[in-house]
């Protein structure tokens, strides 16, 4: 079987089908509005700048910030921003990774947590004069209700087919 992030992997095909289904329904004006959103947000705080990106400062699909990446890979993707903390998602797993140049915080996933725990996850970052306080929380969510609504609307199944 192809690696998970390979376009030929069954999960990628299932994701692509859902993505196309969504694009067909939201229409061009919403697609353009989403495309016009900034790729990053920067907030200046007492703890230093917080940079918020989807995956990394390099791009929306960059995979260099995962817990399995080497320090050199992480530094190549995230260093040089001048931020004291960088918040990102894309991995669908909550974690905090202190780096020499900044505190890296994966803020998690509400709908598809990949750690096997069927709980929505979110992160609260609080800036203090002493640095950052990171609270990563899990809460229950009605996954069955969401899946029922998806089926009723004809959204392709998330389960991959070989």
Model-predicted regions and their roles:
Residues 1, 58, 85-98, 112-115:
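Active-site environment of divalent metal-dependent phosphoester hydrolases
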Residues 1-42, 49, 64-82, 156:
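Active-site neighborhood of divalent metal-dependent phosphoester bond hydrolases
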Residues 38-42, 93-94, 122:
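Short, acidic/polar N-cap/turn motifs at the starts of alpha helices
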Residues 53-56, 60-67, 97-99, 116-118:
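A short secondary-structure junction signal
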Residues 97-162:
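Acidic, His/Gly-rich catalytic cores of divalent-metal-dependent hydrolytic chemistry
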